[in-house]
Amino acid sequence: MGKEQKEKKDGNLSIKEEVEKELNKKSTAELFRKIKNEKISFFLPFKCLPAQHRKLLFISFVCAVLSGGTLPFFISVFGVILKNMNLGDDINPIILSLVSIGLVQFILSMISSYCMDVITSKILKTLKLEYLRSVFYQDGQFHDNNPGSKLRSDLDFYLEQVSSGIGTKFITIFTYASSFLGLYIWSLIKNARLTLCITCVFPLIYVCGVICNKKVKLNKKTSLLYNNNTMSIIEEALMGIRTVASYCGEKTILNKFNLSETFYSKYILKANFVEALHIGLINGLILVSYAFGFWYGTRIIINSATNQYPNNDFNGASVISILLGVLISMFMLTIILPNITEYMKALEATNSLYEIINRKPLVENNDDGETLPNIKKIEFKNVRFHYDTRKDVEIYKDLSFTLKEGKTYAFVGESGCGKSTILKLIERLYDPTEGDIIVNDSHNLKDINLKWWRSKIGVVSQDPLLFSNSIKNNIKYSLYSLKDLEAMENYYEENTNDTYENKNFSLISNSMTSNELLEMKKEYQTIKDSDVVDVSKKVLIHDFVSSLPDKYDTLVGSNASKLSGGQKQRISIARAIMRNPKILILDEATSSLDNKSEYLVQKTINNLKGNENRITIIIAHRLSTIRYANTIFVLSNRERSDNNNNNNNDDNNNNNNNNNNKINNEGSYIIEQGTHDSLMKNKNGIYHLMINNQKISSNKSSNNGNDNGSDNKSSAYKDSDTGNDADNMNSLSIHENENISNNRNCKNTAENEKEEKVPFFKRMFRRKKKAPNNLRIIYKEIFSYKKDVTIIFFSILVAGGLYPVFALLYARYVSTLFDFANLEYNSNKYSIYILLIAIAMFISETLKNYYNNKIGEKVEKTMKRRLFENILYQEMSFFDQDKNTPGVLSAHINRDVHLLKTGLVNNIVIFSHFIMLFLVSMVMSFYFCPIVAAVLTFIYFINMRVFAVRARLTKSKEIEKKENMSSGVFAFSSDDEMFKDPSFLIQEAFYNMHTVINYGLEDYFCNLIEKAIDYKNKGQKRRIIVNAALWGFSQSAQLFINSFAYWFGSFLIKRGTILVDDFMKSLFTFIFTGSYAGKLMSLKGDSENAKLSFEKYYPLMIRKSNIDVRDDGGIRINKNLIKGKVDIKDVNFRYISRPNVPIYKNLSFTCDSKKTTAIVGETGSGKSTFMNLLLRFYDLKNDHIILKNDMTNFQDYQNNNNNSLVLKNVNEFSNQSGSAEDYTVFNNNGEILLDDINICDYNLRDLRNLFSIVSQEPMLFNMSIYENIKFGREDATLEDVKRVSKFAAIDEFIESLPNKYDTNVGPYGKSLSGGQKQRIAIARALLREPKILLLDEATSSLDSNSEKLIEKTIVDIKDKADKTIITIAHRIASIKRSDKIVVFNNPDRNGTFVQSHGTHDELLSAQDGIYKKYVKLAK
């Protein structure tokens, strides 16, 4: 066991180790030094403001300072008011002056708030756009080290910190600082000795703050890394949900999630404990200062009375004024410090953003770079290169070759030998480590303007990425960069004061003449839909697109999930060709196409290659696609062998090539080059061997026939190639709308209902609906932590009662100041009491804050885990919905749950504290002076209501945004609100980063996101004004209330109704309560946001999956007894999310046990859907799809009783369902049997454990190679992993890496080539030892040698391990040895059925069979 555990440890880099590795880039001491020595400008967040907004900042600052300066005046007359009330003198003139000051404070605070809200909106927008521009223009090494999920997570986190730290919190700092300084200076002038005595604890508070701040920063930095890791786990799991479900990997993902969250909680709780300790110390030390003040103030009065201080008229009224002044200034400090902490977080976040914004990319943009009249030649000279993430692995060894205009070049070689990296170097995603890339003999690629260079390149990658947009816009994206030039010019003209933006405009404008710029703008204006249609016809997708209900406006879905792989690839080809590039790069451009589509697209590519002004570069494993290239370069990363084997046997050559020649760690080089014919002459050459491995064996009897027959066949093929057979090819019409939904512009029912017309202010002040009872699940979770809740309860009891008791002691102390006989005794007594209160306050506040945060973290972790777990186990139709994209769901899991914690969980404690404080204060106040207490209670309730209305603005803003989502702002073809959401657009851009860079869409997306931000902020001016008015009232309300209280108290005292002493006791208790009420109401906005988040969280949390692997029901399976026979009987199927598209029509066939069954058909004919049904991603049970016959718009309605989907006309959506003639009912029915038992009757987990699937686009996770291979089988040892790696022909490559099986594959496996990813996926599938192996284009990304090895391995596995194999492939060579080949066909678009089935030879013998035509096209 010890050895196995060691092996597992060696091969498994834990989450903690990964994060510690990240932290160790800087030692702990270095981190402390950095925190200490970072010289960050205090006004850094405002650095990006243009001149006009800086004027607003100055106005806001001045008004905030003047507003705070009004408070010292109130304190200065406080003693006079007390004196006049005791003497019965008139105080009305003083009250009127206080009211006047209150009005001034109201106006000043309102102006300050309005200006700051405008500034905050501008800052957040500018920082976001500058961050995005910088990220978009970074180099490939940067993006290797900073995956999109991390960049997006960091951006959200940092902007949230900036948003929290500026705005009203920033002006609060200056307002209250002004009050603090004014009061403190006044107190010093009044009596410096007493003031200094009271404030002697300030240095200690400062030292504690510095020490605590260092500890908090370090722990929060660590916790942020773990939080980023958690987000990466969530996003990858949702992106690869089909892989997770098919391998029953939910528990594996959840375990990694729990581990990451555990470490996050550990470090965040350390930070929270230090913060709680700091808060407790501040509260306790402030009360200690008052104990000193009470004692020393008495000493001064006594000494003054005995003439120890000559000429000192210091008396009790002076002590009261100073104590109150310092008391309020101290309270100002307690408000300032948390806001300063928030602002310091904003400073640090801004600094982190500017580290990215100011980062100079390794591949510079070359503002003044050269532009060339043409591109005639590209030459690699002794190029060496390694990736920054794997510096020990050299990719190339003195690579040299030349590419010339008008020629076509192909690069071939084993997977991982660096073919795709050549393309990345040409695109200048990276620069060579050594050597040069020379253009036109004399221009180094580094000296050429980067944006201009990339504008001349069209790319079709191996794994095409499309945006969640329409087909039309996806094709147009290649020319949208031209639109950016015009949009950016207008933008910069309007923002001429912004240096950063001007610099970027200079980048473009300096690289071309005004005439060129004008021509490009003119060229963009001519991009018409007809151009899109023309290019679609060239790549043969026009018929397919035209058959869709929305045609070119059809949305492709998140990650193009509504398209098959072949459809995505052809749209990607159309996008590249639309650009008419000077350099056309085709990286496995036809790897996902069926033979017929490949032939047609390849013919188009061949036509394009004839362009005399274009360099065409092709990478392909299908060597038939490159035979007409002018030059073929064969790359190898193996050691040269002088002993060539003369044996012509393919297998022997293959074995020699792979086993005798070891991988060369010094990098790849060109081992052969030439035309197809010249390379084929070398019988022992690698290229010749690769060709032989891909040859398709025709029927032996046909091959042995007469030469004339062969010649005729050859002639027929040539005729078809030249066009004589084109009609026949086109007659095989392409019906590929399996995965396309009817994406008509779907409007929500609520958007069509007439909204209640309520005036704005009435809407603000009307009563809210009660919170949903469902919130009890959160409260229940909170109170499940009984020990923590008990500690919080007692700490609230203590802390809630201490302030009113302190207020009572304060009032009694004031009374003793006029009782000179007992003055010394009473002051000593009250000083001791306050010291005891200070100790109790320190303990209670520390415990309350720490356990409040502790429960919050526990609840957040639990809620996040439950939501993530419930989402993971949903059926696939849930993820097919546009509202459930990975980006949206991950936001729900992270942001919404966090808002629930801060807005509900944490605020419960604060609210409970306030209730306790309020109840004690009211009891005391009513006891001493019921009349004053009643009036003040009424006034405070009105004041609190105003606070609540201000807080509701946040919620109303969100509601208004939702109400306005139906208006069209962008050039999208859908009304879906995602396209108007900046977060969604950023998610799109970051996930498709390579495409954004390739097609120069950096500025396009920045402009699009800017419009989305402007739309989001649209119409907020009135709301800002109302918020400013309410803020002004909140700042001046205390002055108005006190003025009224003094007037009312004076009135009652004059009438003899109450005593001055009782009035003071009642008043002081309410002063403390009112100050805490303001703190409570300032958090009200968080509560409203939390309730909004709960409305999103709760439906996802309680949603029951219709196909749940957690269900233990069903027939349990003994794996050893399963034979593996699969029967498909009369299956009719439509996707619930795409009800108008029939997928299958009475589909029936059998996959025999222990045999290999291959499925072939055109792209989009439903081949992959069969595997989805087999894995029970979708069910055929009780699914009814009801369509309205005259449907124009769709609205989904899920009927939970019979699991049916009802789609109705939105405009007629009502309680009446209409007559039966208005609807057409389709049933998903039929059976899929495994060993003669319906698969729905089996236990779902047991069923999926019988299968292993290797998909066309394999999904790997951001883990080590070892962890990825053992995914789905956690009990596997390192030896098991190594064994299957040899089967998958990937072991030699892994062993050549510095970290071997511990090598991390990067986010989504991006650190590996396509072929390497696919071989690891094959190893992962084999490790599960499945009874049924599903191969969906499993070898599409492999080189010929690896493909042959894998095919041989698969045959051996089938023979030795009793496995049923079901394979989908477009390469006929990979399926010709199958026991049965099933041909899918969908000629009338009414659903796919089985056209024919049989062996390869049987199907070839059929006259005019579709399969025979496929074989012909594959030659």
From Swiss-Prot:
Question: Which cell locations does it reside in?
Answer: Vacuole membrane
Topological category with respect to the lipid bilayer: Multi-pass membrane protein
Record field: catalytic activity: ATP + H2O + xenobioticSide 1 = ADP + phosphate + xenobioticSide 2
Does the keyword section mention Membrane? Answer: yes
Q: Which Pfam families match?
A: ABC_membrane, ABC_tran
Asked if the keyword Transmembrane helix belongs to this entry, the reply reads yes
Consequence of changing residue 199 to A? Increases ATPase activity
Cite the effect that the entry attributes to residue 1337 to Q: Abolishes ATPase activity and xenobiotic transport
- Give the ABC transmembrane type-1 domain ranges: 58-345, 791-1083
Any idea what this protein is called? Multidrug resistance protein 1
Identify the species of origin.
Answer: Plasmodium falciparum (isolate 3D7)
Q: What is the lineage of its organism?
A: Eukaryota, Sar, Alveolata, Apicomplexa, Aconoidasida
